[in-house]
Amino acid sequence: MDNYTVLRVIGQGSFGRALLVLQESSNQTFAMKEIRLLKSDTQTSRKEAVLLAKMKHPNIVAFKESFEAEGYLYIVMEYCDGGDLMQRIKQQKGKLFPEDTILNWFIQICLGVNHIHKRRVLHRDIKSKNVFLTHNGKVKLGDFGSARLLSSPMAFACTYVGTPYYVPPEIWENLPYNNKSDIWSLGCILYELCALKHPFQANSWKNLILKICQGPIHPLPALYSCKLQGLVKQMLKRNPSHRPSATTLLCRGSLAPLVPKCLPPQIIREYGEQILDEIKISTPKNMKKQDSNRVRRALGEANSASMQEEERGRKCSHTELESTGTTPAGNALERAARGNPESGNPQEHGRHTSPASPHRPWWERHGPSSNVEALEKASILTSSFTAEDDRGGSVIKYEENARRQWVREPPEALLSMLKDADLSQAFQTYTIYRPGAEGFLKGPLSEDTASDSVDGDLDSVMLDPERFEPRLDEEDTDFEEDNENPDWVSELKKHVGYGDGPGGQLLGERA
């Protein structure tokens, strides 16, 4: 700390503090994360710094250095002087963002997410509070304290550290999650940018979870285009395999031609080749460009005629994520990076073909009643838990990631535990404690009176069939992570004393 002067505290959480510091040698300001080091988890706490140091991308908060002093780990990062995206949304006070601004920010976030996914990293806590802005228009993804570094592209994720408003359906179902779980959270951010509120609001855990899993999505304001509405719906599909990957979002459909426009020339010159390579999607063998019939045959589409009709009649519920051999964003970036913007025949780069994925299980379409049962009598408050929070940021690398057979909890389990539960500050917390709290689930973007009627009936959340429709694009890549303790619902029961009396703690805050 000898080379740094603390200017002020800019954030605080269960991990410790976030400080604005001045580096005396360079007279530059940086953000410094101060993490308490416990003897039992010192190595684990250091892994966030190791992971962050590996991420070099214009849309990821840059790592400066890390060091230890007096029982603390200090991670020095670039300071984003525009604050976080949550603060920016709240500053609007109901005034909608222009669509061009939303798309510019969203594409930059997607570029950052795509970068970490290409490196087999799951962020696990993507939310508007963890997206940072600069005064010169850059958007950067930060806070990798919950991230996991994977050693294999195909493994199941079993534990989840995140924020309830952004938790995808598969987690409430006690099912494994993968990179598409990050995409769900990304969809929630896009909805917040458009509507200035959370996509799902309720006054009970039961209805919140049911809405997340099967309820309809409240339409975006009429100001925004049909394509933007469809993009949100694609990212909030219940089945993870039906959600587009970050690469698909960037290289196909309406976002593709906008990617070069969201990056200043300096960034394109410095990172153009890297970004171009990251947004490539492998072309199936023997597939000719611009031949839609060959694309359909290569992807195993059973009914070409019906697919053509669906494409012609596509409305707001679908995005333009067709399987094509060319990517507009890639071509534009390559021309800019090579200093030849008028060239129409950019040199082909080698494509990386993803390994064949094992057969994926079919996801049932009913609500996550097991989780709702398990949390029936629990209340939620802002308090931190546990060893995972106390040890600060952590990254765990596994050498073996074998797929497992997953056994679902009985439908009554979580519903029973959540019955009569009160909700408070679920945006920041994931803690279950004994009943006694007042209030309802209220996040920073919640309306003053959160009613279940916002996006569903008070007593019954209607199923939205559109959220169960598969995407047309089947050429996509998923990767997942593994953990030695797969069943978080069982752990939840232990902490809340399910079956042995009233509750206790479950999970802690990830600020």
Curated annotation (Swiss-Prot):
GO CC list: axon; cytoplasm
Protein name according to UniProt: Serine/threonine-protein kinase Nek3
Binding site for ATP: 10-18, 33
Reaction(s) this enzyme catalyzes, per UniProt: L-seryl-[protein] + ATP = O-phospho-L-seryl-[protein] + ADP + H(+); L-threonyl-[protein] + ATP = O-phospho-L-threonyl-[protein] + ADP + H(+)
Domain spans labelled Protein kinase: 4-255
Region (Interaction with VAV2): 1-282
Annotated source species: Mus musculus
Entry keyword set: Acetylation, ATP-binding, Cell cycle, Cell division, Cell projection, Cytoplasm, Kinase, Magnesium, Metal-binding, Mitosis, Nucleotide-binding, Phosphoprotein, Serine/threonine-protein kinase, Transferase
Ranges for region Disordered: 299-370, 443-511
EC identifiers of the protein: 2.7.11.1
Main location: cytoplasm
Enzyme class (EC, first level): transferase
SUPFAM superfamilies named among the record's database cross-references: Protein kinase-like (PK-like)
